[in-house]
Amino acid sequence: VSTYIGSEQFPSRLSTPDPIEFHSILRRMDDAGVEVVVMEVTAHALAQCRVAGLAYDVAAFTNFSQDHLDYFGTMERYLEAKLLLARQAKQMVVNVDDEHLALAVQQGRFLCPVKTVGIRARADIYAKNIEVDERGCNFLLCFHKRFRIPVQLRVPGIFNVYNSLVAAALCNAVGVDQDSIRRGLEAVRTIPGRIELLNTGTPYHVILDYAHSPDALENVLRAVRQTARARVI
């Protein structure tokens, strides 16, 4: 977990820091002339009011799955905590291929305008003609059925197609042009600990991934099995 200001990297103890540390980071960013901040807002941070008073131009939900029940107790309480983010956002980007989030959209639980993304479900921004191998994904990025952009993603796994859809929708919401979105997605390289293919010199592939929840592990195994030519151990 790290914080970046330009090319400078700072270690972080939490995905969403406590308020004192967080506002100190924002102050440092402002002093450096930063105009756009991209951050992860955890359910814990929302429940503990770590980001109270902030207003987001746009926010996103990538998925919702079983996690942190030791803290929240039930899936409904966990979802309620995550939905607090919509109260602080001018608009939301939501993956409606996730059945929990699709239901929340149908029930009107987001208190702001919603843009949807997906592969299987009808969505405002979606991917089609998806091809996946062990090195990456090729797909057609479609915006509101008006224009389409071919994307060559250099990280593998169908879940990274979903991540790309969310990133594209966020950028589109704040006025980034389509060519810049494509170039940004295609510039992404392997993230350490996220389906990271290790160079071990062995006749088989070794993959490192941080997957720590049932949903995350399922996604990793599905991604590996899509391209594996032999047994997955």
Please state what every model-predicted region is.
Residues 190-193, 214-233:
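Active-site beta-alpha connecting loops in nucleotide-dependent enzymes
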Residues 1-4, 41-42:
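Short beta-strand-centered segment that lines the nucleotide-binding/catalytic pocket of NTP-utilizing
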Residues 43-53, 215-224:
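Switch II of P-loop NTPase G domains
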Residues 21-24, 163-169, 219:
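Short amphipathic alpha-helical face segments that pack within enzyme cores
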Residues 30-39, 47, 51, 55-205, ...:
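Acidic, Mg2+-coordinating active-site environments of NTP-dependent enzymes
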Residues 10-42:
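Conserved nucleotide-sensing/catalytic segment adjacent to the nucleotide-binding pocket
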Residues 209:
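Conserved phosphate/oxyanion-binding catalytic-loop motifs
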Residues 8-19, 65-73:
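Flexible beta-alpha connector loops of hexameric P-loop NTPases
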